[in-house]
């Protein structure tokens, strides 16, 4: 059939990208260039009249704003004195954007479009070299230059046929295939497979079988090293590393439910947790409260190789794969929140040379430069989480690159992209059902693409950089968070289904693709898989690619045949494809049949399971170490200036501000604390429900630079850091703590394997001493790269993730100093004698280009247990302060990178207060630099009753020193004074020190944020004092009706409406339920299928990224309403009914603006549009807003209040068709909420058009945050009241003065609940 390639041109919104291109081009080629830009949409269709018959729809969808027509059939860039260069995604694979636009087209009634991709066309001067421009403007791994004849439907691609590798004739043929196919088989593998095919099964393998086995049996997939037989210096180790790790479970509490046997680990949680879920997820149904036993799960993995090759996509797929690990636990589980970590080489930032970075180091072209990894990997992980709807609530970042004393270069050229996540699982879903004949084998999720081919093998080579770049590129996957979200909703719906979970067992697809995941699924049985049952995204896929590609957002599951219809109904509702690809058979044999019946795979799984352990013979190699030599006359102040710029110490604001930290409404503690939202929290905490205060706590620990000195000491310090980060959340018991251990190590390089073995032994011995245990983890043992002929090893790294049940999420302590009168700051040194102040492996050593020869260690683990126990007791104790309660521990922080001085300063930075400190060394011979910069284990406490606390520690035999206090002098007036033994070492303004700490993060921020916004943020940090919240109304009531099913049968109904890509429906449902409504789960699929809104008094349009916001925020969602006549009429009828109300937040706000539900009703059509944030990116923040006098029914009685509120969006800037429209809104009282500053003042109060960033996070004129309809019934707001209606959801909850009025053991309602209660009362 004839296909037509049509080009449409549109206005491009790429000002930030253009600015960066011009700066980068000038820097690299020493010349300024002028650049103009437009979009070009390449539409592949079989319908010649497609454009003309759908022109109005296409203009609406492809124009940037509803206020202008900016789509053309001809290019608007006319190269009279220049030339056009078009850059777009590589044409071999459909992009995630294409998939989402096609979904929008289908919803809008635009048919017969096979593909649509967007290129960016640039107009540059004639003498600009195309290749040079491409190098600056594009990502070579994912983009290409488009010529006029660019093809997206290359029918000349030949499908590669299955072929045999003739191993029966010669082993050399196997060796040749290993090289040509990039299988990364080592000699042991070659010997095994040669014997397997020649002597056991007596046949030649197909290329598909061999490729399958290479991925499934790779180090990445099977962890041979950790399971293998280890010899060190010709002495056999007693047991495998895995055995040693598993044995830690014997010393901890017996609360593990899943350990080392599923996609995530699980521990016992709480017996009865009230949660909302749909009564029937196959259709529209009420949300009902259930009380199941709810357990905690955690999973962590790294995606290092893909991130090295292609940072953005490598990180997106690492995040997506780990999320699927969470939901594919047991028979289906629920993700709640993520953790992240990035380790990269020297940044070499332009204009900011860091004195410890070696200018002579060269970087290979086959992997990305460290600065690009730091920026784009974090962009990728953040983007995926934002679109999926998973908050990122904890993490780390580290940079290292040095030449060690033995002459070796050690640097994170092979980076670490760490992704972890905590979730929940119901008791009945913990165990997978065993496979049994006649069960259906199904694939759920996205279609098959030629991406991620050979990733398991690629990640398992000893040293990266020796393969062809094309093989490495083929192994990198592509992420599609929209599809990931749809897949997750299917799994969650199955697990929540009251009539029985259709999923008997489920595994996520990862390394090895279908070949690996299906073999896992049918272990103990067999299956015949038919290739023509798969949904293909590319018809030219070969059988080898279909069977082994890691194409993302896909799960395999066993389904009871009687429940298959239920699964397919759920999948249709969630718009997620299900393919039945086979049926379980009794014979233990896995077969793959081609379309013509040819056999591509035929493997006896029993024979494959007989493989023996691999044997690893290692040699130890002592470190060459040198004592730390610091410059003579080095002052504390000079040392501090450098230390504050080290990325592991410096501000991580460039990471936290761009990632959602509030979605789900279950986050009780994320990274940012204090009035300036400073990223310093030690522990991350989530609740299991909006109706309870129990949850889970997570902390991370990693100490790789200390491991360079002594692997055993570094491992023990990892334990210490992890536990001292976790200490600030009340948990059930220290022995309930379980950990994931992730090992990133060049273990196959000389000496490194033995060091890894030492570290494992030290870790496990230490954990047994305190009663904690490892219950899962991963390893990445190919952490070396060839750079210009030199092997560069990344520092051996262990990342520990601890998780435990949290008994009360309202009792968490963070590092922000409160400066309460009478409070004091205490220092507790833990685990070693108080005289030891070792600087080896410290930030101070690194910034002077050394590591030293002796690092901190834990010599007494019992002190860790004692201190942990005491702090836990104190977390749950409070004192009366007049009519209110006051906690004993006001603030707390662990001592880690940067040492004691950095920890003290960070607490002051977060609290924005003055501090006066005097530290008394236990020994007069200890130098100030030693005591201030040593990274010995310890904690700092700000306490309200210092005498009592000192006594408690003394009674337990723990030395605790009072070192000073914080004073209620804030911001620009705050001062920092640090004395050591009475001698003044630091005497500076707080804001000056803090800006030194923010400097490197700000420079990294310039690559992703509007420099104007960064400048404004610096000024805000310098002038902010303390946020003054104000609330004069009463909002509290007892929502006991939650437990009364009969109550909801007569309650007013609210439809919680979501579209594909929405992610804020559960928190929205909880808010309205707590207000007294009966809430219903309603999808746009339901409405398009005929479900009406007649029975509802209210509708709520939820937040998220409908269709990934691919054509602009909520544009696809709006099109599904506007271009479907029956839906459009129904929506308009609901809007016009005088007894109805609506509430839209974030994406829902954008939808209401697109539909014209808010704005100036005197003019037809949309008069309000939410444009891109002025900062140029997604922004997540918690800040004050002011509720104005307004006509909204939901905000009645709340006027003049100043309350804290979460904002999380990329396109939230209110713009208007004209200024008169905006003036009418103000005159009519339709502008309901404005952003304000720490004093409760708006830009107008200061005589300005708007407040600076981040007080105004999106740049809206007049600081507008919410607008309602003329009659007040329809309210749309960008910030999230649906994530701020409980006190513990507030980032500043510990500092809100009215919180102590209420018993936190009941539902801790915040003032925002009045919004929802107002709506309820209006309906009565």
UniProtKB/Swiss-Prot annotation:
It comes from the Eukaryota. Pathway: Purine metabolism; IMP biosynthesis via de novo pathway; 5-amino-1-(5-phospho-D-ribosyl)imidazole from N(2)-formyl-N(1)-(5-phospho-D-ribosyl)glycinamide: step 1/2. Phosphoribosylformylglycinamidine synthase involved in the purines biosynthetic pathway. Catalyzes the ATP-dependent conversion of formylglycinamide ribonucleotide (FGAR) and glutamine to yield formylglycinamidine ribonucleotide (FGAM) and glutamate. Its EC number is 6.3.5.3. Signal peptide: none annotated. SUPFAM superfamilies: Class I glutamine amidotransferase-like, FGAM synthase PurL, linker domain, PurM C-terminal domain-like, PurM N-terminal domain-like, PurS-like. It comes from Caenorhabditis elegans. This is Probable phosphoribosylformylglycinamidine synthase. GO terms for cellular component: cytoplasm. In the N-terminal section; belongs to the FGAMS family. It catalyses: N(2)-formyl-N(1)-(5-phospho-beta-D-ribosyl)glycinamide + L-glutamine + ATP + H2O = 2-formamido-N(1)-(5-O-phospho-beta-D-ribosyl)acetamidine + L-glutamate + ADP + phosphate + H(+). Its main location: cytoplasm. Mg(2+) binds at residues 682, 721, 725, 894. Pfam families: AIRS_C, FGAR-AT_linker, FGAR-AT_N, FGAR-AT_PurM_N-like, GATase_5. NCBIfam families: FGAM_synt, PRK05297.1. Coiled coil: none annotated. HAMAP family: PurL_1 (MF_00419). GO terms for biological process: 'de novo' IMP biosynthetic process; purine nucleotide biosynthetic process. It is found in: Cytoplasm. Residues 1053-1295 form the Glutamine amidotransferase type-1 domain. The keyword Chaperone does not apply. The active site is at 1146 (nucleophile), 1280, 1282. One of its GO terms (molecular function) is ATP binding. ATP binds at residues 314-325, 394-396, 681, 896. Keywords: ATP-binding, Cytoplasm, Glutamine amidotransferase, Ligase, Magnesium, Metal-binding, Nucleotide-binding, Purine biosynthesis.
């Amino acid at each position: 059939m004839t296909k037509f390639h049509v080009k449409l041109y549109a206005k491009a919104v790429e000002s930030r990208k253009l600015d960066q291109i011009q700066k980068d081009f000038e820097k690299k080629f020493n010349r300024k260039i002028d650049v103009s830009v437009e979009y070009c949409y390449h539409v592949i269709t079989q319908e010649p009249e497609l454009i003309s018959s759908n022109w109005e729809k296409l203009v609406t969808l492809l124009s940037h704003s509803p206020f202008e027509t900016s789509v053309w059939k001809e290019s608007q860039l006319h190269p009279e004195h220049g030339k056009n260069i078009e850059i777009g995604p590589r044409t071999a694979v459909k992009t995630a954007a294409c998939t989402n636009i096609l979904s929008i087209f289908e919803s809008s009634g635009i048919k017969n479009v096979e593909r649509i991709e967007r290129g960016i066309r640039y107009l540059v001067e004639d003498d600009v070299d195309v290749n040079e421009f491409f190098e600056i403007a594009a990502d070579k791994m994912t983009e290409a230059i488009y010529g006029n004849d660019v093809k997206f439907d290359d029918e000349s691609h030949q499908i590669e046929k299955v072929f045999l590798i003739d191993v029966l004739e010669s082993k050399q043929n196997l060796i040749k295939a290993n090289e040509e196919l990039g299988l990364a088989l080592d000699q042991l593998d070659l010997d095994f497979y040669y014997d397997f095919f020649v002597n056991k099964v007596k046949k030649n393998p197909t290329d598909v079988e061999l490729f399958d086995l290479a991925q499934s049996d790779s180090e990445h997939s099977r962890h041979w090293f950790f399971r293998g037989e280890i010899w060190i210096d010709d002495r056999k180790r007693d047991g495998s590393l895995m055995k040693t790790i598993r044995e830690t479970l014997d010393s901890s509490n017996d609360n593990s439910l899943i350990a080392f046997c599923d996609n995530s680990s699980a521990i016992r949680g709480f017996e009865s947790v009230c949660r909302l879920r749909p009564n029937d997820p196959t259709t529209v149904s009420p949300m009902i409260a259930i009380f199941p036993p709810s357990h905690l799960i955690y999973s962590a993995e790294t995606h290092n190789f893909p991130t090295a090759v292609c940072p953005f996509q490598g990180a997106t797929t690492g995040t997506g794969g780990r999320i699927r690990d969470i939901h594919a636990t047991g028979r289906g589980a629920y993700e709640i929140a993520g953790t992240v970590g990035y380790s990269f080489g020297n940044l070499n930032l332009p204009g900011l040379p860091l004195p410890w970075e070696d200018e002579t180091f060269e970087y290979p072209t086959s992997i990305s430069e460290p600065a690009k990894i730091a920026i784009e990997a974090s962009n990728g992980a953040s983007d995926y989480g934002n679109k999926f709807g998973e908050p990122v609530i904890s993490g780390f970042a580290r940079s290292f690159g040095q030449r060690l004393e033995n002459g070796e270069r050690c640097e994170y050229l092979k980076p670490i992209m760490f992704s972890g996540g905590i979730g929940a699982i119901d008791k009945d879903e913990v165990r997978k059902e065993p496979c049994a004949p006649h069960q259906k084998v199904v694939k759920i999720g996205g279609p098959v693409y030629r991406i991620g081919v050979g990733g398991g093998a690629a990640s398992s080579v000893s040293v990266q950089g020796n393969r062809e770049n094309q093989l490495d590129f083929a192994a990198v996957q592509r992420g599609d968070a929209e599809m990931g979200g749809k897949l997750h909703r299917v799994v969650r719906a199955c697990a929540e289904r009251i009539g029985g979970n259709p999923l008997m067992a489920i595994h996520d697809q990862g390394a090895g693709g279908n070949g690996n995941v299906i073999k896992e699924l049918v272990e103990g049985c067999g299956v015949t898989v038919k290739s023509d049952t798969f949904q293909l995204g590319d018809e030219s896929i070969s059988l080898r690619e279909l069977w082994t590609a890691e194409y993302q957002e896909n799960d395999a599951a066993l389904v009871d045949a009687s429940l298959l219809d239920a699964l397919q109904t759920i999948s249709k509702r969630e718009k997620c494809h299900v393919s039945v690809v086979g049926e379980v058979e009794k014979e233990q044999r896995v077969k793959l049949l081609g379309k013509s019946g040819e056999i591509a795979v035929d493997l006896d799984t029993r024979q494959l399971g007989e493989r023996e352990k691999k044997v690893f013979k290692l040699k130890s190699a002592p470190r060459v170490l040198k004592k730390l030599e610091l410059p003579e006359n080095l002052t504390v102040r000079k040392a501090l200036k450098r230390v504050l710029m080290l990325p592991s110490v410096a501000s991580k604001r460039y990471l936290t501000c761009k990632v959602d930290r509030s979605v789900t409404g279950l986050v009780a503690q994320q990274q940012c604390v204090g009035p300036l939202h400073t990223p310093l929290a030690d522990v991350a905490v989530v609740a299991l429900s909006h109706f309870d205060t129990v949850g889970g706590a997570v902390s991370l620990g990693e100490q790789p630079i200390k491991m360079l000195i002594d692997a055993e000491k570094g491992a023990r310090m990892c334990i210490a850091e992890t536990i001292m980060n976790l200490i600030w959340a009340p948990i059930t018991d220290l022995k309930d703590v379980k950990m994931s251990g992730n090992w990133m190590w060049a273990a196959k390089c000389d000496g490194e394997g033995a060091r890894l073995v030492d570290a494992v032994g030290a870790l496990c011995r230490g954990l047994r001493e305190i009663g904690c245990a490892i219950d899962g983890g991963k390893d990445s043992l190919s952490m070396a790269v060839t750079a210009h002929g030199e092997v560069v090893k990344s520092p051996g790294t262990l990342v520990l993730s601890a998780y435990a049940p949290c008994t009360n999420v309202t009792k968490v302590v963070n590092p922000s100093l409160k400066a309460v009168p009478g409070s004091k700051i205490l220092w507790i040194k833990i685990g070693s004698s108080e005289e030891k102040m070792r600087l080896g492996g410290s930030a101070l050593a690194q910034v002077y280009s050394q590591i030293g020869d002796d690092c901190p260690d834990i010599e007494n683990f019992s002190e860790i247990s004692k201190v942990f126990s005491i702090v836990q007791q104190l977390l749950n104790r409070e004192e009366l302060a007049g009519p209110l309660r006051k906690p004993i521990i006001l603030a707390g922080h662990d001592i880690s990178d940067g040492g004691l001085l950095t920890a003290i300063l960070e607490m002051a930075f977060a609290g924005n207060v003055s501090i006066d400190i005097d530290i008394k060394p236990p020994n007069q011979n200890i130098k100030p630099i030693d005591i201030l910069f040593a990274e010995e284990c310890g904690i700092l406490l700000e306490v309200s009753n210092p005498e009592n606390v000192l006594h408690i520690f003394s009674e337990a035999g723990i030395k605790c020193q009072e070192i000073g206090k914080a004073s209620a002098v804030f911001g620009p007036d705050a001062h920092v004074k640090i004395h050591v033994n009475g001698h003044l070492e630091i005497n500076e303004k707080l804001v000056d020190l803090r800006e030194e700490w923010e400097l490197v993060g700000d420079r990294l921020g310039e690559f992703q944020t509007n420099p104007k916004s960064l400048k404004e943020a610096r000024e805000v940090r310098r002038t902010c004092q303390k946020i003054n919240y104000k609330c004069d109304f009463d909002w509290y009531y007892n929502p006991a009706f939650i437990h009364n099913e009969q109550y909801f049968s007569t309650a007013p109904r609210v439809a919680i409406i979501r579209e594909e890509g929405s992610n804020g429906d559960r928190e929205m449902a909880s808010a309205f339920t707590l207000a007294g409504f009966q809430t219903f789960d309603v999808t746009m699929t339901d409405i398009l299928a005929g479900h009406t809104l007649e029975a509802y008094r209210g509708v709520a349009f939820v937040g998220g990224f409908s269709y990934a916001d691919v054509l602009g925020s909520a544009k696809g969602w709006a099109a599904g309403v506007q271009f479907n006549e029956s839906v459009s009429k129904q929506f308009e009828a609901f809007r016009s009914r005088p007894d109805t109300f609506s509430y839209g937040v974030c994406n829902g706000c954008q939808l209401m603006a697109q539909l014209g539900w808010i704005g100036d009703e005197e003019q037809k059509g949309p008069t309000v549009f939410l444009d891109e944030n002025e900062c140029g990116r997604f922004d997540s923040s918690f800040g004050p807003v002011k509720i104005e006098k307004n006509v909204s029914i939901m905000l009645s009685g709340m006027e003049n209040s100043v309350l804290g509120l979460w904002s999380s969006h990329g396109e939230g800037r209110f713009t208007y068709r004209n200024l008169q429209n905006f003036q009418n809104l103000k005159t009519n009282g339709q502008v309901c909420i404005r952003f304000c500053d720490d004093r409760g003042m708006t830009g107008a109060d200061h005589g300005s058009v708007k407040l600076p960033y981040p007080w105004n996070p999106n740049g809206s004129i007049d600081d507008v945050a919410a607008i309602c309809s003329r009659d007040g019934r329809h309210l749309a707001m960008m910030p999230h009241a649906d994530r701020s209606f409980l006190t513990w959801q507030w980032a500043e909850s510990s500092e809100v003065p009215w919180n102590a009025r209420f018993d936190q053991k009941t539902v801790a309602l915040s003032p925002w609940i009045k919004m929802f209660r107002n709506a309820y009362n209006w309906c009565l």
